[in-house]
Amino acid sequence: MASPDLSLFTYPNETPFVELDCLAAFNALTDKEKLYAHYLSQASWYGGLIVYVQTSPEAPLIFSLIHKLVTAESVEDLKKTAIESGKATEDDVKALLVYISGILANSGNYKGFGDSKIVPNLPKERLENIILTSAAHKADPKAIETLWNACADKIYSLEHSHQHLGFGDKGTTTYFTPNCTLKDSELVGNFMKKYNLEGYNNRLFKYEDDGKTTYEVRMASVLNQQDDEPFLMKDTIYEGCTFRVTRGDYSGLLELVCQNLEKAKEYASNDLESNMLEQYIKSFRTGSLDAHKSGSTYWIKNKGPVVETYIGFIETYRDPAGMRGEFEGFVAMVNKEMSAKFGTLVAHAESLLKELPWPSTFEKDQFLKPDYTSLDVLTFSGSGIPAGINIPNYDEIRQSEGFKNVSLGNVIPTSFKGFRHQFLSEADVAMMDKFAVTAFEVNVGLHELLGHGSGKLFRKEGDQYNFDVETVINPLTNSKVTSWYEAGDTYDSKFTSLGSAYEECRAECVGLYLSLNQDVLKIFGTEGVEAENVMYTTWLNMLWAGSAKALEMYSPASKKWLQSHSQARYVILQVCLEAGEDFVKVTETEPGKNLLLSVDRSKIKTVGKKAIGDFLVKLQVYKSTGDVKSAQEMFNKYSEVSDDGAYPWARWRSIILAHKQPRQIMVQHNTKVNGNTVEISKYPATAEGFVQSWSERFSSSKVESLLESLWQKDAKYFYAEPPAKLSAAC
């Protein structure tokens, strides 16, 4: 078997770093608001360390090792000592700093966008040399060597099952033990449905106990099994296996989260914020998902806060079963000017929903107008920083209480800095350079509010339906609806691993479809010729992402998509290519070297609108009715990467990879309490600045010992041979 292409798994030394600036927005806060934001940020940063435990068996040790390295001395001293030793070059040290940055930016050694492994871009012996000449090693050689020996091989391993996240022998995950397969996931899913449990805040451990297969569903909480407070349920026999629901996952880290949420509560601006934080604390303390749902309800009702935040086990993209949430937390300040535009969009939402192509019976009975704000991010912890969010993800709350939309205003322009658009004509490159930021703002606004915020799920609870089973007609069959969500079903539990890419595709299509509306473009400050250019750029950018970027996130070996948004955009491109009439074309202009994407802008409002509209009807009908089989068949067809025909994407992938640009890493601020106010620190937009920001983020080495103890607790489930104790390092 050929060796894997290292460029797919490394961050190059020229990786760009950009500052996520929010100084003006933060400095405009009162002292009380700054303290509120600071303690929420601390809770988010501590909680973000949970992601290392959720990513791979070795990730907690990698964090502990690199955190010891960068806190024992300055980056400049680390660099100077390594180079002067003669055992490492300046390029070697740069490669290490970029690797460290990649680990910290993704909260683990797998990319948050794409799920592929991150390995150092320098030889193992050179990295070891830098570690052994460091101040951290001089201070405690036994601890550093113990950590290095425990994770060095895993850091560099690119065995097939280590290259990407996934089940069992096909990938790496810590949401499940390695002996779990898709069948195990389905069995556990059925058990959880029967006993009304959801997967957001748990992991699954499978082992033998007294000769019987046992599935341990371990809930995230501060409290452990031995604590007196009553817990969920006793051991249960289901399908001949023992099911054991326990708690105490990430206990020490969640204790730090709760301590900071308690402090933040002292500076809350109203009862809704206090009640929200109280419920989050209860959830993280006890493992109760209902408490987090309650906190989310308070959060939705807290309209237009000056400091916005959300925290918990949220997005399910990286669970191979699509049910378990990765921890994330964000803190941000409202951008009033941009928020006014989103407020106007919300005011028009009900009329815009009527323009969507599915029948009104497939739309929610009542549109609950959400809070929609543009935010300047102060803190975002997790495996990546999105451009926009539509939360909470709990189906029952979204249908009955509503949701919130946030556009991360300082993320959007930052993400376009220094970017080159390949595979386009010079005229289209100029169009993207001029209008891409505005077009993306339009797309994000529509995607979050009316994409994720639209559509009804048909449900049956007992003998009651939430739709008229006698009169509602399926537009694809012209007959009555014959499928729906039963009691205990959620979108995630039914659509599982398909769910994320499918829902992102639906939201992206809504954004494209409604970007044709002149009133929408006017809300975003564009009219006339400029509005037409923004509309064209919105479509061009989506189709460019589907053709020029998406296949970076596809694995030919496993024939598996590694990233939901990338798969969604590729599917949209295929739908538009299928529409014909020379609406969209991709040609190989230089054999094996270059491609050209062209979009006939005169046909967007005709051919393009019809193609996306017809596709949207199918997407929504299958989602509303829970028709996973039809959804899977359709989506798999458009997701196929073929190596023949008019568009040999499997062959063209090598051309796309040859033009690949490194993904940016965003440098965030730190805050620190000084008396009755809070100081904010900024850092250079470099690898050195990024690493420095992390070296100053936590006030003690306690986080290292907590992660090491969590690794030790789980090690027996993830290693064939019991690893060495880390007592020397703890």
Question: Can you annotate each of these PLM segments?
Answer:
Residues 44, 69-73, 265-268, 272, ...:
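A generic secondary-structure signal for well-formed alpha-helical elements
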Residues 2-77:
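N-terminal-proximal low-complexity accessory segments that begin disordered
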Residues 97-101, 106-224, 228, 239-440:
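Contiguous, non-catalytic segments that form substrate-binding/exosite surfaces or channel walls
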Residues 30, 270, 439-461, 507-508, ...:
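Active-site recognition of the HExxH zinc-binding catalytic motif
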Residues 79, 83, 271-278, 461-467, ...:
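Short, glycine/acidic-rich hinge or "gate" loops at secondary-structure transitions
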Residues 455-503:
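Post-HEXXH active-site segment of zinc metalloproteases
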Residues 51, 490-505, 509-622:
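Long, well-structured alpha-helical subdomains associated
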Residues 596-730:
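Extended, compositionally biased alpha-helical segments that mediate assembly or anchoring
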